[in-house]
Design a protein with these regions (language model features):
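N-terminal targeting or regulatory segments adjacent to alpha/beta-hydrolase or S9 domains
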Residues: 1-67, 75
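Glycine-rich, phosphate-binding/catalytic loops in enzymes
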Residues: 4-12, 115-118, 160-161, 224
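Long, structured ligand/cofactor-binding scaffold of large enzymes
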Residues: 66-70, 85-86
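Proline/glycine-enriched tight loop/beta-turn segments at coil->beta junctions
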Residues: 78-80, 88-97, 104-107
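Short amphipathic alpha-helices and their capping/turn segments at secondary-structure boundaries
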Residues: 83-90, 132-135, 218-221
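Structural recognition of the beta-strand scaffold that forms the well-ordered cores
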Residues: 97-100, 143-144, 205, 228-231
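Cap/lid segment of the alpha/beta-hydrolase catalytic domain
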Residues: 101-194
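Primarily recognizes the serine-hydrolase "nucleophile elbow" in alpha/beta-hydrolase
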Residues: 186-238
């Protein structure tokens, strides 16, 4: 007799034939679209509605050999996000975009290499987490998006505060990952509408670490305007 639920789960898992497995019997683009539709439904993407973006540049300055543009954007009616663009100070034409999604930390300023709170310097230095700074060095125009529940979008100086909004989102038939995908797509709309003279989506990439890596993984499934995606972690293979 078995009294261990894990043993039972392994047996049940071995007997499952996943409905959405790829068998090679159908064209891969068709399979991808089928999976996207199913994933979108699971995440609650149908709960989102486009709104007036209320785009506003709040800062445009030059420092440390780089140009730094900050803007805010309404991605859903009643919700705004913070975005920061880093560019080389001497720019001759549009640069491919690199969207940087910071993970569980005090906020997107970590991606910019800016220490705002105690412990930030070690967070940046200890994991090479100043992604946007590195992206500029590699020839990209970097864009750091403040993810929901982090930093200026619901976090605190001690770190993320995403548990309550995440649980509430589930009660509303959606999830935080869906919200972060939606925000990223709306930010891309803003880039195309307002920054086409300095940024291009040709050759663009999306990258992230920790919670930013998880968001990047799902963005790769549903947002196809990027040429490449680099989630370093955390990625679940189910």
């Amino acid at each position: 007799m078995n009294f261990d639920p894990t043993i039972l789960h392994k047996k049940q898992a071995a007997e499952i034939q996943p409905k959405y497995r790829y068998t090679g019997d159908s064209p891969f683009p068709w399979y991808q679209e089928r999976c996207r539709d199913r994933l979108s439904a699971r995440l609650g993407m149908d709960t989102f509605r486009r709104c007036d973006p209320v785009f506003k540049i709040t800062e445009d300055k030059r420092e440390n050999g780089r140009r730094h543009i900050h803007f805010t954007l309404q991605t859903e009616e009643g919700y705004f996000t913070h975005c920061d663009i880093l560019l080389p100070e001497k720019q001759t034409g549009p640069l491919p975009l690199c969207v940087c999604l910071q993970g569980h930390s005090t906020g997107a300023h970590i991606s910019l290499g800016i220490a705002k709170y105690p412990g930030d310097e070690e967070t940046i230095r200890g994991g090479d987490r100043d992604f946007a700074v590195r992206a500029v060095k590699e020839g990209f125009g970097a864009l750091a998006i403040e993810q929901r529940g982090f930093g200026q979008c619901g976090g605190t100086e001690k770190g993320p505060a995403c548990e309550r909004p995440s649980m509430t989102a589930l009660l509303l038939g959606r999830c935080t990952i869906a919200e972060r995908i939606w925000d990223t797509s709306r930010v891309l709309d803003a880039v195309e509408a307002h920054f086409s003279d300095i940024l291009t989506l040709d050759g663009s990439v999306c990258m992230g670490n920790s919670g930013g890596g998880t968001a990047t993984y799902y963005i790769a499934c549903l947002e196809d305007r990027f040429a490449g995606y680099m989630p370093s972690c955390a990625v679940c293979t189910y």
